[in-house]
Amino acid sequence: MERFFESKPVVYMSKFIDMIMLNVIFLISCIPVFTIGAAWTAMYYTCVKVIRRDRGKVWQEYKHSFVVNFKAATGVWVILAVAEGVLAVLTFRLLVHGHGSLSAAVIGLAMAGFLFTLAMMIYAFAVLSRFTVNAKGTIQNAVFISIHHGGETVYMLVLTLGLATLIMMGWKFLPVILLIMPSAYMLLISLIMEKILIQYTPEEEEVASDDAGIDPEDMLYAEEHKDKPWYLE
């Protein structure tokens, strides 16, 4: 019986159910709108820890991240959402009413600003899910990382815009899309994001050296059995 529950089809089905459950919790968490930042942060945290690393339970880990990061995530969300909204409205108005080369240049700048702000959103909530930092520090880190990892930023922007396009084109199937896509999208993002975040994760302190009076054999045993944080596994 144990082999049955450990078989690949059963494991995959269990993960699929967890992803559906995570999507439902995420969508409910987004209803007040101002909580979207905390929900996004908790979604990323839970996807990586529970779905990818098999650590913890969906509801417990989601709730933990949502509560712990609520204040900073809400601040980041409000700032970036307002900026994104202003740039979107400006771009739309210029496309409808703008004429001439100057308008074209402004449209280009507005669109570039819109995409860069979107990139900051993608990075900001992932950073917040991993590190303890305030809203200002989160945005600063997101700006730095999005520029420093330009190739990965482009990939994740394409993925994000592709999902948005899918939602707009398949609006008739929106309930099904929303039930499946959020966690699937976050998992795809995490494949790139985790490789980036690990570069900024402080190394664990080494166990003790021989100079500290510890027997080398004991030190090797301690190193071998030392528990690593789940995100370093």
Where are the regions that the model predicts?
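Faces of alpha-helical transmembrane segments in polytopic inner-membrane proteins
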Residues: 116-117
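Helix-coil boundary and N-terminal low-complexity module in membrane systems
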Residues: 1-97, 101-106, 110, 120-122, ...
